């Protein structure tokens, strides 16, 4: 399956949920997904398009746009294509459905993203602290408006 076929399948199946889909190279594609459809799209990617490996989940902060993005990199063992799937989230209440039930390894990725950006993954089985000390919880140190840098970073607390 090539990049164009994957894009056509995604946009055909989810015409209202997928936007700005494009091919960056023969092996890299990108798309935005409606935050309320992200889990369903991931289920389709895994079940129908053989995107069986979640490589990462992370966040990006855009304070000037008043939003965060949840970013998923998903690959396939059956075809040489990596998909970057992004979901825009409002900065004041960034939440999205967890994909742990689709990709088991999303567990720690989502925990880390929650801890560092404040993106809440609904229905995550155990959204508890992973890397930050207790007194930094809720400070979202990777957001661009974090005021604790450089004195309140984990590196300086050790």
Curated annotation (Swiss-Prot):
UniProt enzyme class = oxidoreductase
Its main localization is: membrane
* Reactions it catalyzes: methanophenazine + reduced coenzyme F420-(gamma-L-Glu)(n) = dihydromethanophenazine + oxidized coenzyme F420-(gamma-L-Glu)(n) + H(+)
**Biological process terms in GO annotation:** methanogenesis; methanol metabolic process
* Summary of pH dependence: Optimum pH is 8.5.
Q: What is the topology of this protein in the membrane according to its UniProt annotation?
A: Peripheral membrane protein
Q: Which NCBIfam families match?
A: F420_dehyd_FpoC, NuoC_fam, PRK06074.2-2
The name this protein carries in UniProt is F(420)H(2) dehydrogenase subunit C
């Amino acid at each position: 399956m090539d990049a164009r076929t994957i894009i056509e399948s995604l946009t055909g199946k989810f015409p209202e949920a997928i936007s700005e889909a494009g091919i960056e190279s023969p092996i890299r594609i990108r798309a935005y997904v409606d935050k309320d459809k992200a889990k369903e799209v991931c289920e389709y990617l895994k079940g129908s398009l053989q995107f069986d490996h979640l490589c990462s989940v992370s966040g990006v902060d855009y304070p000037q746009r008043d939003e965060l993005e949840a970013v998923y990199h998903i690959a396939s063992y059956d075809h040489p294509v990596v998909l970057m799937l992004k979901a825009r989230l409002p900065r004041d209440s960034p939440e999205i459905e967890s994909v742990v039930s689709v990709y088991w390894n999303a567990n720690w990725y989502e925990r880390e993203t929650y801890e560092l950006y404040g993106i809440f993954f609904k229905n995550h089985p155990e959204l508890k602290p992973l890397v930050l000390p207790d007194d930094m919880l809720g400070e979202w140190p990777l957001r661009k408006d974090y005021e604790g840098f450089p004195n309140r970073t984990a590196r300086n607390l050790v």
